[in-house]
Amino acid sequence: MKRIAIITGLLSGLLFGVATPFSKLLLNGLNSFQLAGLLYLGAALAMFPYMFKKNSNLKLLFQSGNRAKTTGIIFFGGFLAPLLLLAGLKSANAASVSIWLNMELVATAILGVLIFKDSLDKYTWLGVFLTIIAGVTTSFGEGFSGITSGLLITAACICWGIDNHLTALADGASPQTVTFIKGIVAGSVNFIIGCLIATQPIHFGSIAPAIVVGVFSYGFSIVLYVTSAQNIGATRSQILFSTAPLWGVVLSYIFYHESFQWVHVISIVLLAFAVIVTNILSHKHKHTHIEAEHIHYHQHTDEHHIHLHGGKIVSRGKWHSHFHTHEPITHEHPHDPDLHHRHNHEKLL
């Protein structure tokens, strides 16, 4: 399962990475609110066919246990964060913004430890430190405007950090459902606001391209990220997702012919090393699971998934998703802070 989670995390970074240079181009015909709205409406469009399936569990996102999480996901991740990002993108080159976006990893890690019971080992903390150094190094190449952009994008990353943890803990809802709700609500609100405050007519030729970018970079990318986060934890998934700048920087050089700066080279090397060191080990200790019910993609290959399907045993290697119950169990094995391992570690420190 961890191997699949690593692959989906890397793919989510690739898809999101291409959004930065394309978004900078689209801002020529759309304001920040309009573009943010269209990007998330594209995400909702990508997930729309899935909502007709019986296991979408849309109503579970609005039950008492998930209502506050869902509201936070929409507000911080779907509304506030993209606006701050696009504001920062206006006054800095796309390559630098792509690298700064990895401050989301730092925000996710700190919030995870302080609030969301995310246990981090020394390798993960090293990855966080390297990411901070990469972001600071990039700022040196941008001058004063880089400071303003860096602050705006850091604020966006804090919002996405909150979104990441709330999404990873949204119990009972599939990644596709979370993406659809965030996309349809945040997308509609942002786009309407953008049209109301617009100082010039909307450039209709930019609408379709913005939606297409949203389908891939905000739709499929979010689903892949959520799948990864629910299996190895938000912080570790964010480290994999932080490969996004590699693709954003490359496309920025291709589309905008931005100068190849030494600070970008150093930052990319630091980020690559951060991804490697944070995926070395999982920690191991004796822990107890209480009874739980939720939905996520899984195989029947561990002690957490031994349930039957209509009285029948499912093939161990078959991937599937449905609402299921976990029985209480106490055991010891290597694990990451996934949906099943959000226990406290105070006694171990």
What are these regions (language model features)?
Residues 1-37, 142-169:
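Glycine-/small-residue-enriched transmembrane alpha-helix faces in small-molecule transporters
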Residues 47, 111, 120-140, 149, ...:
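Hydrophobic transmembrane alpha-helices of multi-pass small-molecule transport proteins
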Residues 15-20, 48, 52-95, 101, ...:
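Specific transmembrane alpha-helical segments of multi-pass solute transporters/efflux pumps
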Residues 26, 35, 39, 88, ...:
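Hydrophobic/aromatic residues within transmembrane alpha-helices
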Residues 29-80, 107, 159-163, 180-198:
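Transmembrane alpha-helices of multi-pass small-molecule transport proteins
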Residues 19, 42-46, 100-114, 129-130, ...:
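Alpha-helical transmembrane segments of compact multi-pass small-molecule transporters, enriched
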Residues 13, 36-38, 82, 96-105, ...:
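Helix-helix packing/entry segments at the starts of transmembrane helices
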Residues 31-43, 87-104, 146-158, 204-218:
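Structural signature of hydrophobic alpha-helical transmembrane segments
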